[in-house]
Regions:
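Terminal alpha-helical anchor/extension segments at protein ends
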Residues: 1-147
């Protein structure tokens, strides 16, 4: 059986599991927490949006160009993508299964290198990072085949 990693993720947590045989239980081998994604918007930015006055004397609030939470989720997705590429290049896995919160799954897909995307043999848009390994296993194909 190919070396298989199962990545379970959201914008705050990533858990990586492996399996010994195609039908065996999951074994957690790595975990990451991105605490910045837990912060409130006001804690992520140094300044509040400003205000401008128009000719009529009324003011208008200026909006931030980017959403701080989305920015942090994107940073985390890039970090995980780089980690997955380095691990693949070090022959730590040969095929990858991904279960991720829908928005984070989209961010992660956009960050993954083409050679890593080719190794993805299963993905599911579901947020189950807080579930037990046994419960996560139930969301995967019963028999993990070689990609």
């Amino acid at each position: 059986m190919k070396l298989t990693w199962i990545l379970v993720a959201d914008n705050v947590h990533v858990r990586i599991f492996t399996v010994d045989t195609p039908s065996s239980a999951l074994e957690e081998i790595e975990g990451f927490t991105h605490t910045e994604s837990r912060l409130h918007d006001r804690e992520m930015t140094t300044d509040l949006p400003g205000r401008i006055k128009s000719d009529g004397g009324s003011g208008h609030a200026l909006e931030q160009k980017t959403d701080p939470k989305k920015h942090e989720a994107d940073n985390f997705a890039h970090y995980i993508a780089r980690y997955l590429e380095a691990a693949y290049n070090s022959n730590k896995y040969e095929q990858l299964l991904i279960i991720a919160e829908p928005t984070f799954l989209g961010l992660l897909r956009n960050c993954l290198a083409k050679n890593i995307l080719k190794q993805v043999c299963f993905d599911l848009d579901k947020n189950i990072t807080q579930h037990s390994a046994a419960d996560i296993r139930k969301h995967l194909p019963e028999y993990l085949t070689n990609h």
